[in-house]
């Protein structure tokens, strides 16, 4: 059964372009990234704590796997904030989301983990930078927008994956029907 596993980067870029119409998003994300650079691992750990607490993933009971996941996710968050308009972070994201699809992880759980982490990131920004700064709301908005961008790409990945699954299923059913009635070779 051959099926398309990759998301077209042009589709991802189209979503990035919509969010990047605000030309201030990239500089604000870079500033957030610089402010939180020493806390990226904390953000990543908080994200993975959600998945660990579910108790559904045996591989997350292995401390080495958890450490690798936290380290990779911290690097991903840094790349996303450092170059929100770039493609590298989104390629990593689409690979991770396609893996989640193939493993049957519901989108609602992925969204919950990201949204929960978003609130934690805003809390950290307030602690590190302070809510009294004039541009705090702009920086908080950048975090929310970056998460909205990420969630949009995630939804597109899940939609594409399920469309491919349905197309594959229809082809298989059609081939089976043709075989059953003696049309196929």
Question: Model-predicted segments: where are they?
Answer:
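Elongated alpha-helical scaffolds
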Residues: 98-125
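Core of compact, soluble alpha-helical bundle domains
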Residues: 1-95, 115, 122-185
């Amino acid at each position: 059964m051959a099926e398309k596993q990759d998301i077209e980067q042009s589709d991802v870029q189209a979503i990035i372009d919509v969010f990047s119409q605000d030309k201030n998003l990239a500089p604000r994300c870079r500033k957030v990234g610089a402010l939180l650079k020493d806390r990226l691992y904390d953000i990543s750990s908080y994200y993975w704590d959600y998945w660990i607490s579910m108790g559904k993933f045996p591989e997350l009971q292995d401390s080495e796997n958890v450490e690798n996941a936290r380290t990779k996710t911290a690097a991903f968050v840094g790349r996303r904030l450092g170059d929100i308009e770039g493609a590298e972070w989104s390629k990593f994201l689409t690979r991770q989301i396609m893996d989640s699809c193939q493993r049957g992880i519901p989108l609602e759980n992925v969204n919950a983990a990201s949204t929960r982490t978003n609130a934690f990131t805003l809390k950290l920004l307030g602690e590190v930078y302070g809510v009294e700064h004039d541009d705090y709301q702009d920086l908080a908005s950048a975090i929310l927008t970056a998460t909205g961008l990420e969630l949009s790409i995630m939804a597109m990945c899940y939609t594409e994956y399920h469309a491919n699954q349905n197309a594959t299923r229809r082809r298989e059913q059609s081939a089976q029907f043709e075989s059953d009635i003696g049309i196929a070779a």
